[in-house]
C-alpha cells in the first residue's frame, strides 16, 4: 500500500499585543491635536482678521493641478483649472456672503477631520457638531472683524473646488460601474462557453478536471487560512471563514452522492448513512462548536493520506456490517470522512489546538502527532484526541469570555468617561455663552464710549476755538488800553511841560474844539433825523412787502378762480352743445310727428271714404230678392252687415225710392 506522509509547517504565532489602550491613547492624542490646531487657527483668524483655513483647499487645488499636469498632460490640467475657476465664479456671484463664509469654514474643518485614519466614529461626529455649532452661533454673525473682500474669493474656492472634485469622482464611479457591468457580461459569456466545452468532453476527463479544480481550491485555501489565523490573533474577524469551512462539506456531499450511485449500480446492499449515523452526529456537534469559536486548522496536506484509506475502510465497514453491527460505533470519524472522500472536520479543531499550544514544546509534539497519516492512528486514540480538542476548545472559549468581560468593563469605563466629558462640554458651552454675552456687552460699551469720545472731542474743539477767539479779543483790548494810556500820559506830560507857554494857543484850540463839538452835535441830530426817516421808510417797505404777500395770495386765489371759471366755461359750452343737439333732435322728432299725423289724417280720410262707399253699397242691397223658401239650407248671412259699420252721419237719404249715385 502506498504511504504518504504529510509535511506540517510550523506555525509562528506573533506576539499578542494589547492594542486597546494603545488605540484609546492614540485617538485621544489625535483629537486633542485637532482641537489645538483648530483653536490656533481661530486665534490667528481673530488676531490677523483673515480666514487662514481657506488656504488649505487652495493648496490642495495647486497639488491637484500639478499632479494632473504631471500624469495627464497640459490639456487636462488647463481644462481642470477652467472648470474650477468657473465653479468658483458661480459660487462667488450667486451665494450670499454670510452663507458662503459659513459653508466654506464648515466644509474645511469637516473635511480636515474626515481625512483621519479613524473614519466616522463618535469623536469625529462630536468634533463636527462642535465645529458647526461654533460656525453657526458665533462666526456666522460676526463678519465685520474680517477683510470680507479679501476672504470672499478663497471662500468661494472652498465651495467650488469640492464641487468639481465630486463631479469628477461621480464620473469615475459611473465609468467604473459600467466597466464592472461589461466585465460581468463577458464573464457570464465565457462561463457559458466553458460549460459547453466541459459538457462536450467525455465523463472521465470531466471527473479528472473536477479533481484538479478541487486540489487547486484546497491549495488556494491554505494561504487564505494563514491570513485568517493572523487576523484572528490580532483581534479581527476572518473574512474567508465561510469559504474555508464550506469546501470540505461540499466535497463530502458530492463524493457521498457519487458513492451512493456506485453502490446502487453494483448492488452491494450497503447503506453507509445508516451505518455511520453516530459518527455523523458527533462530527456535526464538533463542527457547530468550531463555527462558534471561529477556529480552524491547516490540514490540506492530509488529503493524499486519506485517499489510501478509501478501499480498506470501505471493506472493513462492509465486513463489520455483515458480522457485528456494534463495531460501527467504535469506528473513527476519520475513517468515515475518508470513505466519503472529504477532509475531516476535526482538522479545524486540531488547527485551533495548534494555535493555542504553540508556545510550549508539548504543543509542538502534539502538532507533529496530528500530522501523522490517518491510517496509522488507532480508533481509541482518535476519540481521545477529539475529547482533548474539545477540552482545549472549551478553555479557549473561557479565555475569550474573560477577554469579552474585560472589553465590556473597558467599554463601561469609556462610557463613564464619555459622560464626564459631555458634562464638561456642557459646562464649557455655558461658560462660552457667558463669555460671548460679556464680549457682546463689552463691544457695545466700547461703541458707546467711542461715540461719547467723538462728541466730547467735537465740544473740546468748539471750546478751543471760542477760547482762541476770546483770547484774541482780550489781546486787542489790552493793546488798545495800552495805547490809550500811552496817549493820555503823553498828553498830560505835554500839557505839564507847555502849560505856562501856550495858554493862548490852548484857548484857541479849545474854542475850535468846542465849535467842532457843536458842529458834530448838529451833524448827530441831522443823522438821527435821517435814521428816523429811514426807519419810517423801512416800516413802509415792510408794510409793502406784507401787502405784496397778500397780493400774491390774492393772485394765487385769482388764478385758481380763473381756472375754475375756465373749467366751468368749458363744461357750460359742452352743455350748450348737448342742448343744441337735443333741440335739433327734438325738431326732427316734431317734424316726423307732424308727418305721421298728416299720414294719420290721410288714412282717416280714406277710412271715411270707404265707410261712405260701404254705406252706399248697403243701401243698394235691400232691392235684391232672394228665394229663401226654395232652398232647404240655412240662411246665409250677408258678407257686409250694417252692424259692423259705425253709426256716422251720411249724406245719403235712406227714404229715397231710387238710388242715385253721387256725381263727382
UniProtKB/Swiss-Prot annotation:
Name the family the entry cites: Belongs to the macoilin family.
Transmembrane residue ranges? 28-48, 75-95, 120-140, 154-174
Listed name of the protein: Macoilin
| One Gene Ontology biological process | neuronal signal transduction
**UniProt keyword annotations, A-Z:** Endoplasmic reticulum, Glycoprotein, Membrane, Nucleus, Phosphoprotein, Transmembrane, Transmembrane helix
Q: Where is this region: Disordered?
A: 253-274, 320-367, 631-664
Q: Which residues of this chain are annotated as glycosylation sites?
A: 324, 340, 452, 655
The record's GO CC annotations read: nuclear membrane; rough endoplasmic reticulum membrane
The annotated regions of Polar residues compositional bias extend over: 320-348
Q: Which organism is this entry from?
A: Bos taurus (Bovine)
Record's compositionally biased regions (Basic and acidic residues): 253-265
Lineage, uppermost ranks: Eukaryota, Metazoa, Chordata, Craniata, Vertebrata
Amino acid at each position: 500500500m502506498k504511504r504518504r506522509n504529510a509535511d506540517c509547517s510550523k506555525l509562528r504565532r506573533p506576539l499578542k499585543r494589547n492594542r486597546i489602550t494603545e488605540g484609546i491613547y492614540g485617538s485621544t492624542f489625535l483629537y486633542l491635536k485637532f482641537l489645538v490646531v483648530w483653536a490656533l487657527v481661530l486665534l490667528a483668524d481673530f488676531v490677523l482678521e483673515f480666514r487662514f483655513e481657506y488656504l488649505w483647499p487652495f493648496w490642495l487645488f495647486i497639488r491637484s493641478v500639478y499632479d494632473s499636469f504631471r500624469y495627464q498632460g497640459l490639456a487636462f490640467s488647463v481644462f481642470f483649472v477652467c472648470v474650477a475657476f468657473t465653479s468658483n465664479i458661480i459660487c462667488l456671484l450667486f451665494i450670499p456672503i454670510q452663507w458662503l463664509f459659513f459653508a466654506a469654514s464648515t466644509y474645511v474643518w469637516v473635511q480636515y477631520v474626515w481625512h483621519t485614519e479613524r473614519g466616522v466614529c463618535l469623536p469625529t461626529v462630536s468634533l463636527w457638531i462642535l465645529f458647526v455649532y461654533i460656525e453657526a452661533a458665533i462666526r456666522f454673525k460676526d463678519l465685520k472683524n474680517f477683510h470680507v473682500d479679501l476672504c470672499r474669493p478663497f471662500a468661494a474656492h472652498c465651495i467650488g473646488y469640492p464641487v468639481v472634485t465630486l463631479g469628477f469622482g461621480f464620473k469615475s464611479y459611473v465609468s467604473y460601474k459600467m466597466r464592472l457591468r461589461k466585465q460581468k457580461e463577458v464573464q457570464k459569456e465565457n462561463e457559458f462557453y466553458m460549460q459547453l466545452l466541459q459538457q462536450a468532453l467525455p465523463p472521465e476527463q470531466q471527473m479528472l478536471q473536477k479533481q484538479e479544480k478541487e486540489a487547486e481550491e484546497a491549495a488556494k485555501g491554505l494561504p487564505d487560512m494563514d491570513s485568517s489565523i493572523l487576523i484572528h490573533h490580532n483581534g479581527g474577524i476572518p473574512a474567508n471563514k465561510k469559504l474555508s469551512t464550506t469546501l470540505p462539506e461540499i466535497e463530502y456531499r458530492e463524493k457521498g452522492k457519487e458513492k451512493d450511485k456506485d453502490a446502487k449500480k453494483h448492488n452491494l446492499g450497503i447503506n453507509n448513512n445508516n451505518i455511520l449515523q453516530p459518527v455523523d452526529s458527533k462530527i456535526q456537534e464538533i463542527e457547530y462548536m468550531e463555527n462558534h469559536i471561529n477556529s480552524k486548522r491547516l490540514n490540506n496536506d492530509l488529503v493524499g493520506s486519506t485517499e489510501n484509506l478509501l478501499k480498506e475502510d470501505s471493506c472493513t465497514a462492509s465486513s463489520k456490517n455483515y458480522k457485528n453491527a456494534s463495531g460501527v460505533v467504535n469506528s473513527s470519524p476519520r475513517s468515515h470522512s475518508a470513505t466519503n472522500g472529504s477532509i475531516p472536520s476535526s482538522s479545524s479543531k486540531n488547527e485551533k489546538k495548534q494555535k493555542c499550544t504553540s508556545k510550549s514544546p508539548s504543543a509542538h509534539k502534539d502538532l507533529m502527532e496530528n500530522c501523522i497519516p490517518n491510517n496509522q492512528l488507532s480508533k481509541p486514540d482518535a476519540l481521545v484526541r477529539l475529547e482533548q480538542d474539545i477540552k482545549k476548545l472549551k478553555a479557549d472559549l473561557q479565555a475569550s469570555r474573560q477577554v469579552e468581560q474585560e472589553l465590556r468593563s473597558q467599554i463601561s469605563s469609556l462610557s463613564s468617561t464619555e459622560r464626564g466629558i459631555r458634562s464638561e462640554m456642557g459646562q464649557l458651552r455655558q461658560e462660552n455663552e457667558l463669555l460671548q454675552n460679556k464680549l457682546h456687552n463689552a463691544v457695545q460699551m466700547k461703541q458707546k464710549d467711542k461715540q461719547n469720545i467723538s462728541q466730547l472731542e467735537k465740544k473740546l474743539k468748539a471750546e478751543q476755538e471760542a477760547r482762541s477767539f476770546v483770547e484774541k479779543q482780550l489781546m486787542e483790548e489790552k493793546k488798545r488800553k495800552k495805547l490809550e494810556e500811552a496817549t493820555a500820559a503823553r498828553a498830560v506830560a505835554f500839557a505839564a511841560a507847555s502849560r505856562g507857554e501856550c495858554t493862548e494857543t490852548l484857548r484857541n484850540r479849545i474854542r475850535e474844539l468846542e465849535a467842532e463839538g457843536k458842529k458834530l452835535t448838529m451833524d448827530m441830530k441831522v443823522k438821527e433825523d435821517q435814521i428816523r426817516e429811514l426807519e419810517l421808510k423801512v416800516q413802509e417797505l415792510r408794510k409793502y412787502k406784507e401787502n405784496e404777500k397778500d397780493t400774491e395770495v390774492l393772485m394765487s386765489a385769482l388764478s385758481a378762480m380763473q381756472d375754475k371759471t375756465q373749467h366751468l366755461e368749458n363744461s357750460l359750452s359742452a352743455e350748450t352743445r348737448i342742448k343744441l343737439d337735443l333741440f335739433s333732435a327734438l325738431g326732427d322728432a316734431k317734424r316726423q310727428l307732424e308727418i305721421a299725423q298728416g299720414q294719420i289724417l290721410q288714412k282717416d280720410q280714406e277710412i271715411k271714404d270707404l265707410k261712405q262707399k260701404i254705406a252706399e253699397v248697403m243701401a243698394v242691397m235691400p232691392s235684391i230678392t232672394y228665394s229663401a223658401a226654395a232652398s232647404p239650407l240655412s240662411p246665409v248671412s250677408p258678407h257686409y252687415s250694417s252692424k259692423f259699420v259705425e253709426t256716422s252721419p251720411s249724406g245719403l237719404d235712406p227714404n229715397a225710392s231710387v238710388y242715385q249715385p253721387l256725381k263727382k
